[in-house]
Amino acid sequence: MPIATESVSFYLQLTGRLPSLDSEAAPSQVPPTLFDVEFMTKPDLIHAAFRLTPEDDGALAAHLSGEFSNGPISAPPEAGFPFGGLLAALCAGAMRQGLGIEAPLRSLTVQYLAAARYGQSLHFRPRMLRGGRNVAYAVVEGGQGSKLTHHASATYGADGPTPVPLTPLQAPPPSLDCLKDAPGISGPMAPRFSQHVDYRFENGPNILGGNEGKPVVERVWMRVKDGAPLDELRMCYLLDALYPPAWTAFKATPMMTTVDLRCDFLADPTPDAAPDGWVFFEYRLLDHGLGWSVDEAIAWGADGSPLALARQRRKLL
């Protein structure tokens, strides 16, 4: 894979997604970001990162800021690639905005086909497969020029009454206030995208072997730092806003790249369930072998109600 040698150690430490196997350029060859971050606050950066601008040909354009690189903050943004949680959010946003869908998002699957480059617009072209009063199906393709970088599909649908509802995932999280002094993610090897998230770990972080010989689980309260209420875009961002759980099982972290991410949205968050945007997450390794690593994330509201879950497949390199 044509990736700069000096960048490999960064990925091995704290970043969660490598460029695709057919990436054409090393990170050092990627043009600089178009964002003028010097004069933007963190909320401004986050809002700009989620922004999709309609273009004359019907596409929606996003500009990728190096502030959302998965490379470490101690290196230039070009040492990493655009954060996959943000790209998932952009795919979801492009379908809703471009197709005028009003029903709640209930599932999203994103395939990461190739690495998008900084300094170029990323264009999304959504398409409705089938609309309906109760359920609607949509897809979107994202790319730069003739290069396809992402493909996503989504299911939207209205909620309805259920005679006997069951919530087996109900699990009250630890008190947010009790973890107000808990550690977060910081230091020179922290990925740039993590600067836009508040973290409060329960018995963590355990990266670089902290879970060796134990269940491979990380539990953490998280919120996006823009002060906005939690919505589907921010949930997409947070469901991927941690290092691979497998990296807590090994002192020497294995190289891997995400190939797809599926998110299921079980309930729309309310201010009571996500106070000030905070949600409790559990990231868990499900399988690691045969050249693959599969993990999941579950998001709970403050009352223990399950809000969303995600499953991610990564190719070991």
Question: How should each PLM-predicted stretch be described?
Answer:
Residues 4-5, 15, 25-26, 33:
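Ala/Thr-enriched low-complexity intrinsically disordered regions
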